[in-house]
Every structure is written in structure tokens, then in C-alpha cells.
Regions:
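Glycine-rich phosphate-binding loop of actin/hexokinase-like ATP-binding domains
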Residues: 19, 30-39, 85-91, 111-114, ...
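C-terminal, non-catalytic interaction/recognition modules in large multi-subunit enzymes and RNPs
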Residues: 12, 143-151, 282, 292, ...
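Terminal amphipathic helices with adjacent charged low-complexity linkers/tails
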Residues: 163-209, 554-556, 596-613, 678-686
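Glycine-rich beta-strand-to-loop/alpha-helix junction loops that act as flexible
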Residues: 69, 164-165, 193-195, 244-245, ...
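Conserved phosphate-binding loops in N-terminal lobes of ATP-dependent enzymes
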Residues: 9-12, 16-20, 28-31, 35-41, ...
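Charge-patterned, long linear interaction tracts outside catalytic cores
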Residues: 233-280, 518-558
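Short, ordered loop/turn segments at secondary-structure junctions
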Residues: 24, 89-92, 165-167, 195-196, ...
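N-terminal glycine/serine-rich phosphate-binding loop of ATP-dependent small-molecule kinases
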Residues: 1-85, 131, 138-160, 171-193, ...
Length: 689
């Protein structure tokens, strides 16, 4: 017993906090869900640790802890961050107010630009000026800087963001201003725009820096509280935090750069999904994560998550590399309601975990989870591993007014809500696939999250996906995915240059400088779990005159060879044609940013092998009356833990496990593959017809 050690993954969602514990010696997984404590998220984790204690886990044996969190995200969405000041180049005080002068909804003249996180009265002009190449036109005026700081102090603001024009080319004035403030006013938090991501486009760089300092106090406080409580519970280590790019960093880095954690939890789920893609021999996957609050998808192509170089959050651009994710609709807590025309709607309002759906016994609003229960998909005695008793009568009472207005029975109204939610998901998923140029028929649908496997078969049928893949622990995949993540750091150099004027020697020198910068980050981390490192080289490129770029990967080995830039030019033409269907061989090609990604690979998890089938016929543990698309069926009910390699379950069927429930539709069948995944296919495909 003395040699036992554990790895623990934690993910805090809007409704549940998930824990995934792996025994490093045996590969045995222990997974559980506990309600998220909205006002005190760390307490949800502590509640989960206490449940692990009750199962006989020695918390002092946890040697590796990874945490996906939404503290920064919630702080931004709820606009409960710090009161800040912004110092800008003289003449640019309106940068946060003007934004990009684009309506959020181009065809709606009433749509509003997001309210700046820093009001204009707290934006201070500073006399200084760099020109576009980074050379100094006007020196920084320290007296004016000092006067502005005095006003910040008099208004009792918590910190200052410094964002000067063209600082990405030369940060000298930003650094000079920060050093002055730190020396004379050490009580103030100060952040320069080039510290996080020195990329051109002034508005985007400024906004991201503002968001970082805006959410920083809440994230710092949370991490300090969490580390303290972990220590009190006997956990001997500090957590690593998942980043939006799918990588890990230590808690100290997360406290300094919390903007890198905004998409932390969902990104961990996609990383876990990428591992499933490899194990299931399904290189092309649509990940379908349905939790209590929302449904999100991501695309895995050739076993790798697709990445985005920027994201929009509450109308604010976040120009950091992140796993590309799209919110496509309702979650289990989405509220049922009728619009003015009497049409049934699902969401976007969610009941969350407090008070939760009506079937939790606390709330009064009908939600999607209540519909699942009424239609017979859920076992009221086994929800969340049996830790939460559902009340069907409460769900029916909540649905009764809706059913009356629709002139339907309660079951018909619940069934209709499920179909409305699926239709919403289908519409939005189809749009995403079309915009990215993907054919859903070439992809399988990977369902996870607490509610994903319940509706995945409906959605796969609608989009004509190859099949549905449900991993062994779908309800806690984000927590497990965090355990499989590597340490990742990205670095960027803004360099607007015509590719035809770029020599290979210059290109190599720039990438070598960036690689050193990214690699140095690893030496600053408290990391003891890296197996080896690898480097990816990327460039943002476009045809001259275009407004935005596409990502061009460069081979590290290719750079070492004696090649000229014309090989890069041809590679860009081919990439542009593949993504957009056309190319312009006569146009000049422009590089705007060079980027390097360094990956510190962590040791693989020692997963337990799947048991072979006994050869005995499968016997359902029970049967249940269910309601699907206005028809009644008698569904076979199975326990997921009794299904072994090669086992086949024909629909209609329900497969129950502690963290989720999977619904298999009529004319579909599920089988267990060699990695323990449940693969749901059309019966015709299963029999090779």
C-alpha cells in the first residue's frame, strides 16, 4: 500500500464538479461528480475529495493534480472583475470605446457594442510615440505619467494596464513606464500589453491585456484558497492548470496570466477526446460536450484538435491560440419556455445546479433534464452515481403548464422539448461544419459531458455521422482529459514582411529566437513530469491586400535543409486552395506573425485493459418504457460496467453508468471496442449491409 500513488484530474462545470482519479500502478480509474458550489467553487472540489476519502483513497498519495477551471471566464461574463485604469498613447483614449466600429450583428442596427471593461474616464493619455518600425518619435514623459498615476490612486483603482502604440515592435516605453510605477508606487498592479502576447493590432492587444488584469484578482484569490484547502485535506502538491490551448501550466503562471485559462475546462475535454480518437481508430471526430449549462463542439481532424488563433468572448477578442470550440445550443439545465407565438423553446437560460431542474426538488422551472426523466431516459435512483435522487413528480408538475398550453400530454411536451433542443444543435452544428468545409459524413460523433450521450444518437442520425463514440467515462472526460494533457507554451513575433523578400537565413534566425523564448518558459515552471519536448513552427500568412491570415505550418526539419522561400510560397498557395477553393499564383504573399509552440510531453496514462467477452448472451438488468418522437417503446436497460469487449446492444436501449446515461435509438446498435468505448452504429452498417 505504501507504493500507491495517484493522479487526479478536476474540472469545474456550471452544474457539476468532476473528479477523475487514476491509480498509477494499476490504471484503475475512480470517477465521481459533485454539485458545483457556485459561490465557492473550491468547496465543490473539497466535497469531491471527501467522497474519495469515504471510498478509502489516501489523499496524501496524490502525486499529480491537474485542474480545469472557469473562474476567470465567469468573472468576465458576470463583469465582476477589478476596477482598473488604462494608459495609452496620447490621442488614443477612445480605443476601448471605438473598438473596431463594427456592429456585433451587421444587419441589426440596434445591436450594441460591448461596454468597455474600463470606462473612458479611467483611460489616461500619456505623451510618448513610437512609429511603425519601433523607433522612438517622442520620448516618454515621466511627469505626465506620474500625474496620471496620482489620479489612479485618488480614485482607488486596483491596477493599471499600459498599452502604447506599436509597442509590439519595441516595448521600451511600456517597460520604462512599468518600472517607474513599480519603483514609486509598488502597491499598484501593472501590466503591459506586450508581456502577454506582443502581436500587432492595437485594439485586440489592449483588450486582452485589460481582460487579463480584470480577472486576475479573482483567479489569484481562488488559487490561493484552493491550495490552502488542498493542504488542509492532506493533498501534498500544488495543482497544474489547463490552458485554452490544451496545454498545462503551473498555478503561479495561471495566477499571473489568467486570460490563458478562459477556455480551460472545455479545452481539456477536447484533449481527452483526441486520445479517444487515437484509441478508437477514429481520426476524424466531432466532439460533442453537453453539460448542465451549454453544449459545445470541436473538430478533431487526423487525430489532432483544430486550433483557433483568436476567439470572441462577450464581444471581446482574445488573440491567443486556443482549441477551436463552438457553442451550439442547450445543456441539461436549459429552461423550457414558450415564445409569444406559442412555440416551444429550449434555453439559452439555464437553471444551473442551484436550484437546478425541477426534478432536483428545489427549482420550479422545467428543464431539459426533466424532459429526459419524463421520457424515461434517466433512472431517477441513479443520477450522478446515485448521489442525487430525481423526482419525476416534480418534473411533471413543472411541465404541466407547458403541456396545457401546447394541448399535449406531459410526455408529449417533454418529447417535443428534446426534439427542439436537438434541432437547435443540428442547425448550429451544420453551420459550423459548412463554414469549416467539413462533411459530417466523414466524421464520427464523440459524445461526452453528463447529457451528451443522452442526445448524441439523435444528432448523429440528423447529420448522417458515421457513428457515435461514447468513451468509458463520458461524464468526466474533461477531468480525465486534463490528466492526458501536455505542457504547452506559445510565443509570437509580429513581422509584416513580403515572403518574396524574406531570406531563409532571416527566417531561421527569427524562429531560433522564438524557440529560445518559448523553451525558456519551461525552465520557469515547477514541472517534474515532462518526458520529452517537441517544437512546432507556424506562420500567419495571407495574400497581400487581404485583411486576415491563415495558419501555415513549417517543418522543423525543412528549415534545417538548404531550401529557399519559394517552397514556402508553393506551400501557401496549396494551403489556400485547400481551405478556400482558389489560389492566386501571381499575388505576393505576406507573413504577419511567426509563432512557435513548444510541447513538453507528459507520460501516458496506464489505462486498464478491457475485459474480454465471456461469450454468454447479454441479459438486460431491466426494461423501461420510454417515449421517442411521439412513440412508446420498451427499452432494454444495461449497466455499462457489465458490457465487455465485443458485446452488442440493439436499440432501443439505455446504458447506465455513474456519470451519464446513453440512449440507443431503434435500428441502431452499440458495441464495446478494445479501448472500452461504446460505438453506436446503424444496424445495417454493423452487419455490413
Amino acid at each position: 500500500m505504501a507504493d500507491v500513488s495517484y493522479r487526479l484530474g478536476i474540472d469545474i462545470g456550471g452544474t457539476f464538479t468532476d473528479l477523475s482519479l487514476m491509480n498509477e500502478a494499476t490504471g484503475e480509474l475512480t470517477e465521481l461528480k459533485t454539485p458545483t458550489v457556485t459561490d465557492d467553487p473550491a468547496q465543490g472540489i473539497i466535497n469531491g475529495l471527501k467522497l474519495l476519502k469515504e471510498r478509502g483513497v489516501d489523499l496524501s498519495k496524490i502525486q499529480y493534480l491537474v485542474h480545469g477551471m472557469t473562474i476567470g471566464l465567469n468573472t468576465l461574463l458576470q463583469r465582476k472583475g477589478a476596477d482598473l485604469a488604462l494608459f495609452v498613447t496620447e490621442g488614443f483614449q477612445d480605443i476601448l470605446s471605438l473598438q473596431r466600429l463594427r456592429l456585433p450583428i451587421p444587419y441589426d442596427f440596434n445591436s450594441q457594442l460591448p461596454e468597455p471593461l474600463i470606462p473612458r474616464k479611467h483611460v489616461y493619455p500619456i505623451s510618448e510615440r513610437l512609429i511603425h518600425d519601433g523607433s522612438i518619435k517622442k520620448p516618454l514623459q515621466l511627469q505626465q505619467l506620474d500625474d496620471a498615476v496620482q489620479q489612479v490612486i485618488s480614485k482607488k483603482l486596483a491596477g493599471i494596464v499600459i498599452s502604447f502604440l506599436h509597442s509590439y515592435q519595441n516595448p521600451v516605453h511600456e517597460l520604462q513606464a512599468k518600472a517607474y510605477i513599480h519603483h514609486h508606487y509598488p502597491q499598484l498592479e501593472v501590466l503591459t500589453s506586450t508581456e502577454l502576447w506582443p502581436q500587432m493590432r492595437e485594439y485586440e492587444r489592449t483588450v486582452m491585456s485589460v481582460v487579463n488584469l480584470y480577472i486576475q484578482p479573482k483567479v489569484k484569490q481562488y488559487l490561493q484558497t484552493l491550495k490552502s484547502r488542498l493542504k488542509e485535506e492532506g493533498v501534498p502538491i500544488s495543482p497544474y492548470i489547463t490552458q485554452s490551448n490544451g496545454g498545462l501550466m503551473d498555478a503561479e503562471s495561471a495566477a499571473t496570466s489568467p486570460v490563458k485559462t478562459l477556455f480551460s475546462g472545455p479545452a481539456a475535454g477536447v484533449i481527452g477526446a483526441a486520445r479517444i480518437a487515437t484509441s478508437a481508430n477514429e481520426p476524424n471526430l466531432i466532439t460533442f460536450d453537453v453539460g448542465g449549462t451549454s453544449a459545445d463542439i470541436s473538430i478533431i481532424q487526423n487525430g489532432q484538435p483544430t486550433m483557433a488563433q483568436s476567439n470572441q468572448l462577450s464581444g471581446f477578442p482574445i488573440i491567443l491560440p486556443s482549441v477551436a470550440m463552438y457553442s451550439i445550443g442547450a445543456g441539461g439545465g436549459s429552461v423550457a419556455w414558450l415564445d409569444q407565438g406559442g412555440l416551444l423553446k429550449a434555453g439559452p437560460e439555464s437553471v444551473g445546479s442551484q436550484p437546478g431542474p425541477a426534478s432536483y426538488g428545489k427549482g420550479k422551472k422545467a428543464a431539459l433534464t426533466d424532459a429526459f426523466l419524463i421520457c424515461g431516459y434517466l433512472n431517477q435512483d441513479r443520477f450522478a452515481g446515485g448521489h442525487l435522487q430525481l423526482q419525476r413528480s416534480a418534473a411533471e408538475i413543472a411541465f404541466q403548464p407547458i403541456a396545457d398550453q401546447l394541448h399535449k400530454t406531459v410526455e408529449q411536451a417533454a418529447d417535443q422539448l428534446i426534439q427542439v433542443a436537438v434541432a437547435n444543435m443540428y442547425t448550429e452544428l451544420s453551420n459550423v461544419m459548412e463554414q469549416q468545409g467539413f462533411d459530417p459524413r466523414d466524421f464520427s460523433l464523440l459524445a461526452f459531458g453528463g447529457a451528451g450521450p443522452v442526445v448524441a444518437n439523435f444528432l448523429a442520425r440528423e447529420i448522417h455521422a458515421k457513428n457515435v463514440v461514447v468513451p468509458p467515462s463520458p461524464g468526466t472526460l474533461c477531468a480525465l482529459g486534463a490528466l492526458t494533457a501536455d505542457f504547452i507554451h506559445d510565443a509570437v513575433l509580429s513581422k509584416k514582411i513580403c515572403l518574396q523578400d524574406y531570406t531563409m537565413d532571416e527566417l531561421k534566425q527569427d524562429y531560433e529566437m522564438l524557440s529560445r523564448k518559448a523553451t525558456d518558459w519551461f525552465s520557469q515552471q515547477n514541472i517534474q513530469h515532462i518526458k520529452q519536448t517537441s517544437i512546432l513552427l507556424l506562420a500567419d500568412a495571407r495574400y497581400q491586400g487581404q485583411a486576415f491570415e491563415i495558419e501555415l505550418p513549417l517543418s522543423v526539419d525543412w528549415l534545417k535543409q538548404e531550401q529557399d522561400v519559394y517552397h514556402l510560397i508553393e506551400a501557401f498557395h496549396n494551403l489556400h486552395e485547400r481551405q478556400y477553393g482558389h489560389r492566386d499564383d501571381q499575388a505576393n504573399i505576406e507573413f504577419t506573425h511567426l509563432r512557435v509552440r513548444v510541447i513538453g510531453e507528459t507520460p501516458p496514462l496506464p489505462f486498464s485493459p478491457v475485459d474480454e467477452s465471456s461469450g454468454q448472451p447479454l441479459i438486460p438488468q431491466s426494461y423501461r418504457r420510454i417515449f421517442i418522437e411521439e412513440k412508446e417503446y420498451e427499452a432494454s436497460v444495461y449497466n455499462r460496467s457489465t458490457l465487455s469487449l465485443g458485446a452488442v446492444v440493439k436499440g432501443p436501449a439505455i446504458i447506465e453508468q455513474d456519470d451519464t446515461t446513453t440512449l440507443i435509438l431503434p435500428k441502431w446498435a452499440g458495441s464495446i471496442d478494445h479501448s472500452g468505448n461504446l460505438v453506436i452504429s446503424r444496424e445495417a452498417a454493423l452487419h455490413g449491409n
